[in-house]
Amino acid sequence: MKILLAACNAKYIHSNLAVFNLKAYAKEYDSQVVLREYTINQLKDDILKDIYRCHPDVVCVSCYIWNITFVRELMQDLRKILPDVPFWAGGPEVSYDAETFLGKNPAFNGVMVGEGEETFLELVKHYVDGSVTLEETRGLVYRKADGALQNNGWRQLMDLSKVPFAYENLEDFENRIIYYESSRGCPFSCSYCLSSIDKKLRFRDINLVKKELQFFLDHKVPQVKFVDRTFNCKHDHAMAIWQYIKDHDNGITNFHFEISADLIRENELELMSTMRPGLIQLEIGV
């Protein structure tokens, strides 16, 4: 049994943290889960050829606003050469209206909605050893044998500290940006943004975060981009991380954060003023 996790990134230097998290969470089935990353700038035929050569028994693909059109067209073509292989979609672009997505995209068998780690693990168990049924797996919307759609509902949000560290092997990320997550969710309710739908904001244990940041520092990773929606929404969390990377600066690694300017406090500005130029980058929406 071979389950393929496929990601179509915007550029080669990007990496897809989500699929690496899924593979890490299903570590007990590591030999059955294969990961492939592509870009939306590649020829579709080259991607189709690579996927076909993998001989997958199941294909799972990650969907975002920047790749959804490309992915839909790709999977429609892939269905012609892999007519009997189950195709699953996941990610924010398909989670919130999964039934409509499946209605418009007959190439797909189902959608993993919401957070994928636990759902993907159960999906792997279903296909590998049959220990879990689709019917009992929360977080799935899928086509039944008669073509009707089955919606199992969303599963409860998980403890972010239980997500395994995805970067034990850095060889796959040479000359690429490392993405890191210390929180999930967003405190705001912007009507144009999918992030606002998930109202529960959760943080990874700060001691675990420091341990993982030290791993990047020890390996002199050029850049680490935090994917936290609003990094400085919890001041003690942000200050603890900024203080740690200042105190353990290796002179090489740069850290990138998305923050809200109106939440910045004086003590945060004072700390930033003592940092090495280039140690941090701040991305601020206006």
Features from the language model and the residues they span:
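Short N-terminal binding/cap micro-motifs at the start of the first secondary-structure element
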Residues: 12-18
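N-terminal [4Fe-4S]-dependent radical SAM core
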Residues: 1-3, 137, 141-182
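Tryptophan-centric aromatic hotspots in well-structured domains and transmembrane helices
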Residues: 12, 66, 96, 101, ...
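Radical SAM [4Fe-4S] cluster-binding motif and immediate context
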Residues: 161-286
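Nucleotide-activated donor-dependent transferases that construct or modify glycoconjugates
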Residues: 2-11
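Generic structural signal for well-ordered alpha-helices
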Residues: 19-23, 51, 72-76, 124, ...
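Glycine-rich beta-alpha loop elements in corrinoid/cobalamin-binding modules
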Residues: 2, 18, 25, 29, ...
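Conserved beta-strand positions
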Residues: 5, 61, 89, 113, ...
